[in-house]
């Protein structure tokens, strides 16, 4: 597992992962991960960082190897670009602008916003905007930009992620709380001023330096790609796509069954039933009006052979 175990002490030192916050700005719960203090700054124990980071990378690879998805969350300024780039590279989802309350716990409502965003994008592409007044188009464009900013990273997320990766749990505490309520595992890059409670996979490290953020985010992305490759190699991706298609077909059949026969079919059925009853009533009347009883079809069929015999 190149991605799951591909992090070294040298990489951590070069990225400045070991630099924590000032000693007066610390959370006592991070004490087990602190090596010591130097010049009023806590130094993080990188040996523990290596072990815990590798464990997190393996977990992510296993998640994506089973077809699961990972949600990258980094809304602080120095994390936004890195998180967006790496999550996109890995084919995963991300939140970099602002965490909307209920993104996980009220995903049904979030999907309504996503549907609205897709509708506006379609209107812009198919020329609908060109037929609308300029003032209305400007309003719709502003709405689309706002939705893209907040929901663009989860636009293709059709179901809840199997894992959430956050930069700076102190800032992303709402996301962590929502994931905890739903039982979604959380991986976090946790600095010395953060509370590690609620983080399933703690990665002790500097969550402010861009190089540190880049290092761990890229490793998580590589773990996602590694797991996705295993998933495709196993053939599970094709099976899941087939099951999803069959599920859509089944849902369509159930909708048709609930609708019942079409109106035209019901009219045809009534006409057929009425014609049979009408024929039954008219049959005896014809026989009564005639001078002689009307022969049935069956005797005629039986009489045919006698006629043939006479001809012979």
Swiss-Prot record:
Gene3D superfamilies: Glucose-6-phosphate isomerase like protein, domain 1, Helix hairpin bin. Pfam families: Ribosomal_S2. Residues 232-312 are annotated as: Disordered. Keywords: Ribonucleoprotein, Ribosomal protein. CDD domains: RPS2. InterPro entries: Ribosomal_uS2, Ribosomal_uS2_bac/mit/plastid, Ribosomal_uS2_CS, Ribosomal_uS2_flav_dom_sf. Residues 291-312 have a biased composition (Low complexity). Residues 245-284 have a biased composition (Basic and acidic residues). GO terms for cellular component: cytosolic small ribosomal subunit. Disulfide bonds: none annotated. One of its GO terms (molecular function) is structural constituent of ribosome. The keyword Zinc does not apply. One of its GO terms (biological process) is translation. It comes from the Bacteria. Belongs to the universal ribosomal protein uS2 family. PANTHER family: 30S RIBOSOMAL PROTEIN S2 PROKARYOTIC AND ORGANELLAR, SMALL RIBOSOMAL SUBUNIT PROTEIN US2M. This is Small ribosomal subunit protein uS2. It comes from Myxococcus xanthus (strain DK1622).
């Amino acid at each position: 597992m190149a991605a799951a175990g591909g992090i070294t002490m040298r990489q951590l030192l070069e990225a400045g992962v070991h630099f924590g916050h000032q000693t007066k700005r610390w959370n006592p719960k991070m004490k087990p991960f602190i090596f010591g203090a130097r010049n009023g700054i806590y130094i993080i124990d990188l040996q523990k960082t290596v072990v815990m980071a590798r464990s997190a990378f393996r977990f992510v690879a296993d998640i994506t190897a089973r077809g699961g998805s990972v949600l990258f969350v980094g809304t602080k300024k120095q994390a936004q670009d890195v998180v967006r780039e790496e999550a996109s590279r890995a084919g995963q989802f991300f939140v970099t602008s602002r965490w909307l309350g209920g993104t996980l716990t009220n995903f049904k409502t979030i999907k309504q916003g996503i549907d609205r965003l897709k509708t506006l994008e379609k209107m812009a592409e198919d020329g609908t905007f060109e037929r609308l007044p300029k003032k209305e188009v400007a309003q719709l464009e502003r709405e689309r930009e706002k939705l893209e900013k907040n929901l663009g990273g989860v636009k293709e997320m059709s179901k809840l992620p199997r894992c959430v990766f956050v930069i700076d749990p102190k800032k992303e505490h709402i996301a962590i709380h929502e994931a905890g309520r739903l039982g979604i595992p959380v991986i976090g890059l946790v600095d010395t001023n953060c509370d590690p409670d609620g983080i399933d996979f703690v990665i002790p490290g500097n969550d402010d330096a861009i190089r540190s953020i880049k290092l761990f985010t890229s490793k998580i992305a590589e773990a996602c790609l590694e797991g996705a490759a295993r998933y495709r190699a196993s053939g599970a991706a094709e099976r899941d796509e087939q099951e999803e298609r069959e599920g859509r077909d089944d849902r369509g059949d159930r909708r048709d069954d609930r609708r019942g026969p079409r109106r035209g079919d019901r009219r045809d059925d009534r006409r057929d039933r009425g014609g049979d009853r009408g024929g039954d009533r008219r049959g005896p009347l014809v026989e009564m009006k005639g001078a002689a009883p009307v022969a049935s079809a069956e005797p005629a069929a039986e009489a045919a052979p006698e006629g043939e015999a006479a001809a012979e």
